[in-house]
């Protein structure tokens, strides 16, 4: 049997969790239909097991053409009004993630941060100067620049050309110049392409496609809408397969989430990647529960984001009863393993609290009662409350019916208290448009397209 040849591009370590550790590549190989080469950059060279049925190829060069960089910046500048997130990102070039003069830190520290913010803004403006320039050009000039760049763009590593795949699959969380080059060159040489978007926020927060692939795989139906409205991609080319690493939630839907002993009561706080004074929220929540139920009677577990943005609020948790998750070595993928321990952290919580993050969506997928932290603070422009209004994908989560939330710490505590008093054990949220746990696995859906 002649096998279909797949070239899979993994240029960031988090994709190892999605495509290798999830078992997706193994499933494709076990189907017997595919010959697979995995292409990585030098940074990932030592992170993959070479003793597998797939071949790992380390790319000597992954740099992009100047035309691809121009197209990528131009597309972002032209499309910056298509998403609230793009607009907020554009503002943060000038104003950074922090309040300009956070007086709550005191005059001396506030002045220091004012100067730091100014330096950061200057660096941002320098690094984004081409985008800023394109954003003020008239359409006739941007069209001419785009036309000239399209005539010259296109580059793909010789290692991929020599393999001559039937399909090139690019796993990505941002549309960057490398993706633009690969898509341009594969069009010229007749290789079919799939861009596999690796999270639910990528289409609304990163950039705009300058060139489109044959197919785009996304997390859910709402992401299909974003692909159409923001990127202008034909609906027939956008496939809501889900995420490879989220197939575990399809298995749990099919087999049922194992019953957990929810005694003692437990509240899990899921940390935010953006700068937000969440430790103040965690402390206030823990203090309230200690007063109402007794010290430590209701467990409060704080799970910080594994890669949080720097915060200027140096507040540290003071309540000694708060259990803070300490991550093991994350050097391989940059993220925690989605293993039994990870799932149990969600399933064993009576209430999951947090900003509108991926982990909150995952808690909803396993039916945990959730409370959104959409409080604001006096230090950061990206606090949960502000981000929830300025990020398109977070607004998608805000729109979910019957999802409790707190705009102030008091409101948040009240919402948590209401769930604990009611003894609510599970909630079925209407989130099929964000992620459908009832469909076939990612591997099954991908195989059907690759062999069609």
Where are these regions (language model features)?
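Nucleotide donor/acceptor-binding cores
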Residues: 2-6, 264-267
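Donor nucleotide-activated moiety binding/catalytic core segment of transferases
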Residues: 160, 307-361, 366
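C-terminal alpha-helical cap of glycosyltransferases
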Residues: 437-452
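Short active-site oxyanion
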Residues: 35-36, 167, 211-216, 299-300, ...
């Amino acid at each position: 049997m002649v096998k279909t040849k797949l070239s899979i591009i993994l240029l960031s370590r988090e994709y190892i969790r999605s495509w290798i550790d999830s078992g997706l590549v193994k499933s494709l190989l076990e189907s017997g239909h595919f010959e697979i080469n995995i292409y990585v950059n030098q940074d990932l060279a030592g992170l993959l097991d070479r003793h597998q049925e797939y071949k790992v190829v380390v790319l000597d060069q992954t740099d992009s053409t100047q035309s691809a960089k121009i197209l990528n910046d131009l597309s972002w500048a032209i499309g910056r009004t298509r998403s609230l997130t793009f607009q907020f990102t554009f503002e943060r070039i000038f104003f950074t993630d922090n309040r300009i003069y956070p007086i709550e830190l005191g005059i001396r520290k506030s002045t220091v941060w004012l100067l730091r913010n100014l330096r950061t803004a200057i660096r941002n403006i320098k690094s984004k100067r081409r985008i800023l320039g394109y954003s003020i050009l008239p359409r006739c000039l941007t069209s001419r620049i785009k036309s000239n760049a399209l005539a010259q763009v296109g580059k793909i590593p010789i290692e991929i050309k020599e393999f001559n795949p039937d399909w090139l699959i690019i796993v990505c969380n941002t549309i960057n110049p490398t993706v633009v080059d690969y898509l341009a060159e594969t069009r010229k040489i007749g290789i079919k392409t799939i861009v596999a978007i690796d999270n639910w926020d990528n289409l609304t927060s990163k950039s705009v496609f300058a060139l489109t692939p044959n197919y785009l795989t996304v997390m859910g139906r709402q992401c299909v809408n974003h692909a159409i409205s923001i990127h202008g991609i034909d609906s027939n080319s956008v496939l809501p397969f889900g995420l490879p690493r989220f197939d575990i939630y399809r298995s749990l839907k099919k087999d049922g989430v194992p019953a957990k002993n929810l005694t003692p009561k437990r509240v899990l706080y899921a940390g935010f990647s953006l700068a937000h004074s969440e430790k103040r929220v965690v402390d206030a929540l823990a203090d309230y529960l200690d007063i109402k139920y007794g010290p430590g009677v209701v467990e409060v577990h704080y799970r910080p984001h594994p890669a949080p943005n720097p915060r200027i609020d140096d507040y540290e948790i003071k309540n000694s009863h708060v259990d803070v998750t300490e991550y093991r070595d994350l050097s391989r993928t940059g993220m925690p393993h989605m293993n039994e321990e990870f799932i149990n952290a969600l399933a064993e919580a009576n209430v999951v609290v947090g900003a509108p993050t991926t982990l909150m969506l995952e808690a909803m997928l396993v039916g945990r009662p959730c409370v959104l932290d959409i409080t604001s603070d006096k230090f950061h422009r990206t606090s949960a409350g502000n981000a929830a209004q300025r990020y398109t994908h977070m607004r998608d989560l805000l729109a979910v019916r019957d999802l409790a939330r707190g705009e102030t710490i008091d409101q948040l505590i009240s919402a948590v208290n209401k769930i604990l008093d009611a003894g609510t054990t599970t909630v079925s949220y209407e989130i099929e448009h964000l992620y459908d746990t009832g469909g076939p696995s990612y591997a099954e859906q991908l195989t059907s397209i690759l062999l069609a």
